[in-house]
């Protein structure tokens, strides 16, 4: 989407909110309990993406986490927030957190949202950069987070 693009620093951060019907390709995982989340073959979700400078990227991560919590609070869905350990965050991420909603029918919390703080991992491959007001060009930082996974949270 922004491969080989250079943003002006004053344009940052750039944020997107997208809605999509997603499909899982993993055969045989539908309905299975996989590390605290129930896999669904098809699901609808809203996803947040952010392109920012190194100085503001952690604030973007906190903003996305805050949006997730706000939505759960507005819907009055009991939840807990977890900071993921290094083993669970995946290769591109420097930091990650999950929101788990309380599912009374299962008498347990289940993952419904995730937020990933990726620093410049994605922009290195994409060569997505920012031109500072000083003229220096450097890699941007990226964040992504589930705004709302309709089937999971409801």
Please describe what each predicted stretch is.
Residues 1-154:
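TRNA-recognition modules of translation machinery and tRNA-sensing kinases, especially anticodon-binding
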């Amino acid at each position: 989407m922004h491969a080989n693009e250079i943003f002006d620093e004053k344009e940052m951060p750039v944020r997107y909110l997208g809605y999509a019907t997603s499909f899982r390709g993993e055969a045989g995982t539908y309905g299975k309990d996989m590390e605290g989340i129930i896999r669904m073959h098809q699901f609808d979700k809203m996803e947040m993406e952010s392109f920012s400078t190194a100085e503001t990227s952690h604030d973007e991560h906190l903003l996305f986490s805050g949006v997730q919590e706000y939505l759960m609070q507005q819907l009055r869905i009991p939840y807990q927030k977890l900071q993921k350990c290094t083993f669970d965050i995946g290769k591109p991420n420097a930091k990650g957190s999950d929101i788990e909603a309380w599912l009374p029918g299962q008498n347990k919390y289940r993952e419904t949202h995730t937020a990933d703080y990726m620093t410049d991992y994605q922009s290195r491959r994409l060569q997505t950069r920012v031109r500072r007001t000083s003229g220096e060009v450097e890699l941007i930082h990226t964040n992504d987070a589930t705004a709302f996974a309709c089937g999971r949270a409801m």
